[in-house]
């Protein structure tokens, strides 16, 4: 089961040198203060300022109108790295705290997964800001391999993209 609560997390200033904890199990909490079942898997340097965002099972919107939608497409089990720090919901949370546009969100996902690893299955996230929409598909590189295999494609103006639990990006340059 996924958590059913929603909470608006306030913008915050953080001390220089602070660290931000990364967890597994966040989608299965019963309320915003429930820490049963959470597993701390690591820490990353905290940003000095984080934006307010809507915290749901898959965090989805911040105060800068950066929005993220998620759909799972699984991917091969052989590409899942259980030691990768980030699951998709934690990547979404960090992106919404730190980014104000879709392109920066994609860059941050690339940086975080290269540095700390991606431990989830195949996911497609739609990342939108007031000016453009991108589809990013991501999966692990394999057991014991830090990083992620990902591709992103901009949705052209005037077009619609639908991702219903299947990969949508067909061609890469």
Protein language model regions, located:
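Cysteine-dependent hydrolase recognition
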Residues: 96, 102, 120
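A contiguous strand-loop segment
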Residues: 1-87, 108-173
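Second-shell loop/turn segments in exported
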Residues: 78-81, 90-99
